[in-house]
């Protein structure tokens, strides 16, 4: 044998290597081994299913439901030995089995019996072609490709030359055309992998009737007309006829063809709940998907995991079943928000963008050691008093679209956290309303801007200022945070000490949260936001984390007063804003405009201007305990009297006739920003247009009464 004949050709670069080499000397590719096709039937089977279910057309990116195998490459046999010539080829996976085997070793398919019409040459190896004595090294030579073309068939889709024994293209999985009709179908077929079911049926019929030598002759039954193109390896060995498998495949194919982008995102979100992937849920929510959507029978069949998915399940059901507490906090809040919402920022996008530019222009960085960002304008958002002039039905519709009813109910009814004092809520017109906003980690920033300017932090302007302030003033905020965390732990009897490296790691994590859009924020970030606003922030929130069963999991630690303690008092405003906290979600708490009162609190020096709205925010809880002041230094910590004195220094405080210590929030429509006023008016006009229809109907009823 010549030197050229004993070498083996690399299937990638065609370099001829010595027989002792196990890898290609040039490209380091693995040497092909064996006399059968080197593509594992199990891999090829899963690859077929993966390609059929490939969601690339949905633009949803990678999916845990789809596992395509795009790494399949053609493998070439080096030679045909006499030993392999006696083997028979499986008609399903083309694996070469020993002559004595009655079933395929790989896929367990039944060996076909010898047909009377088959020639002796084809009976031993099924559909395996006669071996040609062609040097495998010379086969990759461009000059000799024409001589070996008889061993290959060219795919009509990707033009790859496949071995004669291959029933489907190794590269694109396109079926091999066997006659003129099938070739015409292949030419008119779309380039995508989605195959029309009628064309597939025609192709099967033509193959079963026009290729009697390649396949067994048609039986008395019509089994050959519904023969499968390929077999799912996981179903090989399962009890059931080929007709049932074919029907199952066609059903899955039809389901997949009906799937849209939102459907794939929903299935990925379901898998994300099971596997703990929050990103899949966020992707589904951001696409506008319905959180309360239920799994259908077809979707459960496509997921193919009965132990996890069942018909009628929603994302909430799956989160409960797999105990995803963090996801439940988001999903339960989102389910209640399926009603159409219409807040002022949504009505006029042009005005909203102008307000965002105004906020960005009013952000400045203070010069000096404490280089924190701050806002130059004092703006407080309130609901317009004109709402009370609308008919009751229109008012109800307005509140449904602008308020978060679930948050309002939890803070008012389930726990007396806000509006627990009839004196404040009724007589002093200081009832607080929870505005609806986005969920996830941006809710704190959204609620802060809603309580001031009435818009979202859509462009992350406030988040960027938060991150830059934390980064540039890291030493100042780090000292306050470290002292406060140490004191808070000791107040609960937890006496421990951490190394400085551990403190630094925790602080680095807090810094990283501020820079990531959508990341949840903590108490430290509220403290920094109070400095950016240059005004106090009062948080009214639930005291305990609870599971969906109502079990207490721990303290929330958010409720309390956050003062801009690192600024000079003369540089800050004393009018606070109020936020609500429930189930990992922040909401802006705003009041409704009133006409102002002269002397409603003991020791209060109120502005008598009728245009000024004064809202009384309690500084005690329903049990008359003083709210905690967060991030106090060791010198500022003291008893309740000392903390009350500190609150009076930073806030305009007074005591009501009922003995409730309150802080006064002052706002004025005339002094408010004109863009905010214009935005609110446009939003209110939307509901004023509903009024004439209701008024006309009432008038008609009155006329009918007069006639009677």
UniProtKB/Swiss-Prot annotation:
Residues 432-592 form the OTU domain. Ubiquitin thioesterase, which specifically hydrolyzes 'Lys-29'-linked and 'Lys-33'-linked diubiquitin. Also cleaves 'Lys-63'-linked chains, but with 40-fold less efficiency compared to 'Lys-29'-linked ones. Positive regulator of the Wnt signaling pathway that deubiquitinates APC protein, a negative regulator of Wnt-mediated transcription. Acts as a regulator of autophagy by mediating deubiquitination of PIK3C3/VPS34, thereby promoting autophagosome maturation. Plays a role in the regulation of cell morphology and cytoskeletal organization. Keywords: ANK repeat, Cytoplasm, Hydrolase, Metal-binding, Nucleus, Protease, Repeat, Thiol protease, Ubl conjugation pathway, Wnt signaling pathway, Zinc, Zinc-finger. This is Ubiquitin thioesterase ZRANB1. The keyword Mitochondrion does not apply. It catalyses: Thiol-dependent hydrolysis of ester, thioester, amide, peptide and isopeptide bonds formed by the C-terminal Gly of ubiquitin (a 76-residue protein attached to proteins as an intracellular targeting signal). SUPFAM superfamilies: Ran binding protein zinc finger-like. It comes from Homo sapiens (Human). A zinc finger (RanBP2-type) spans 3-33, 84-113, 149-178. The gene is ZRANB1. GO terms for cellular component: cytoplasm; cytosol; intracellular membrane-bounded organelle; nucleoplasm; nucleus. GO terms for biological process: cell migration; cytoskeleton organization; positive regulation of Wnt signaling pathway; protein deubiquitination; protein deubiquitination involved in ubiquitin-dependent protein catabolic process; protein K29-linked deubiquitination; protein K33-linked deubiquitination; protein K63-linked deubiquitination.
